[in-house]
Amino acid sequence: MNKHKSANQNRLIISISVIAIILASYWQVQNYGFISYDDQLYIVDNYRIHSGFTFKSIVDALTNVHTGHWHPLTIMSHMLDWNLFGDNAGGHHWTSVIIHILNAVLLFLFFQYLTGAIWKSAFIAALFAIHPINVESVAWIAERKNVLSTFFWILTMFLYVWYVRSPSWKRYLPMFLCFALGLMAKPMLVTLPFVLLLLDYWPLNRTIINQQNKNQAEIPEPISLKKYKITSLIWEKVPLLFLTAISICLTFYAAKSVGTIASLNILPLNKRISNAIVSYALYLKKLFWPIDLAVFYPHLDLSLWQVSVAALFLLIITIIVCKYFHKYPYLPVGWFWYLGTLVPVIGIVQVGGQAMADRYAYLPFIGLFIIVTWGAADIFKKRISIKIIAMISALIILALTVVAHCQVKYWRDTFTLFSHTLNVTKNNFIAHNGMASELLKQDKIEEAITHYNVMLILDPKSDIPLVGIGRAFSIKGENDAAIATFRQALKLNPESIEAHHNLGFVLFQMGRLDEAIAEYQKAIELNGDNPTLYNNLGNAFAKQGKDIEAIKAYNAALLIRPRDAGAHNNLGMVLMHLYKYDEAIRNFKEAIHLQPEYANAHFYLSEILKRKGLSAEAEYHLNEAIRINSEYKNIDKLQSRHNIGK
């Protein structure tokens, strides 16, 4: 009884300690903002999550693949966050941290339940909790899919062990459903059935393969006394493999639908294989030396000797693992866990432009943590006292906590993140683009252009830096130069939505409305799912006095993004011109509801209310408009058409 009570106390103390080291590193993220690199795509500008939990939004999450991924459960988690926290990034960060805490504690409890080795399980959980390579998965809100899917991965492993204790379909079904939920969070979980096969070998010991494991005494009782042939264990996983096959098909469909899968013409197969081999080796380096971590690693020109050395290194490890797999069964489990779970993201099927990514190591490194933990115990237990081992372990965790704390700081904002990335990588097209975009927001035009020029050197055939330079010219008021640059970008890529959109905006500002409308319509033809394009098209029609066309465009924008304050305001102004005052009032009030400090909506709402004889309410909204923007004291109410889009 006392032993059982002591074990429970140890589990509680370890769980609290794991939580404490995570909070020590990640507490700061509550003050961080969104990153202008996928956070906009998944959260800030993703109108699909802004409408809350409705039947329509849930169906949309289950059917839409606009990001190039099918992960409806992750979309729903962002939806819930937006309901709770809105655009307060701190709340979104906390959700990711809490899920990471759950993952680390569950990982500890799982290995302790599976092996009975409480302190080894604690060390694995601590490494997972605080290793700096996992910072990207936790501190980057857009990577919610990583932490959320891992939660279901660990839960599925728990349910699998529960099933193994007393196999039945009633126990298999919860595991099956949990795995399905994990795949709906991120398809990287497709390798889980193969990891379960590894666990069948060790520590579940369900196979007929003999083991000479010295650590079997640590397992309090056999989880399953029955031994199975490998073929039987594979057949047992067939329903899970069926889900894997479905997920793979959905993933390919989603990626192909938005063109995120790189063709072999862009990145030949031999280069992909070379990069995969070197990346496997580089991940191992980051395990032991987690510095110079970056949000994006560009592909490098790898020499034959680099690929050969990496391949030889991996081959030697694999040979050692195979040689000692009977004596040290954790070696093949950990090593093939690492190799196997990286397969979907190692780059043979290239999605995106990265050579490798820290976030991809979140799950695979668990396999390496198994090897490090059990291997170190076997090496040192007869040579060093338990107290010294405990002290060394504590120092390792402390050092990793400090490094992780420093790594988290790079995620405070976009500028800091990409500045660091440029410092630790070379020829990084994506990082230069991120820096340039941030510099434009800060009105540091010349510095931004410098980064865009570097991008042109790195990839002269890319339209992206030209679009950026065009935006810079536009901000400077050099519209002719901006137009010429956008047209140059369109020569390189006639289907550049950003080039058409930005060109249309400059033409709109210059009063060349027919040309602007043509560019907006071309952009909509390329991407009819962008409400901003419809809103800007409506503005151009409204400027021309084509109110009916403008109303159609604004309604199209609101159909896609109902909570668009700007579109409601602009629609209200056009309706006001048509003397449809009640409809105009409804739209102005909705704009103010969505954006209380919307001076333009307050001002023109006051004008309509005054015309309807509602003087007191009209005066309130007029005063609000002037409070927000004193320029509304002298504005000519009859020139409202000029304020379309404000």
Question: What is each PLM-predicted segment?
Answer:
Residues 1-480, 487, 491-505, 509, ...:
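Polytopic membrane enzymes that build or remodel cell-surface glycoconjugates and lipids
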Residues 432-439, 451, 465-476, 485, ...:
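TPR/Sel1-like alpha-solenoid repeat signature
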Residues 611-646:
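Terminal, low-structured helical/coil segments at or just beyond the last alpha-helical repeat
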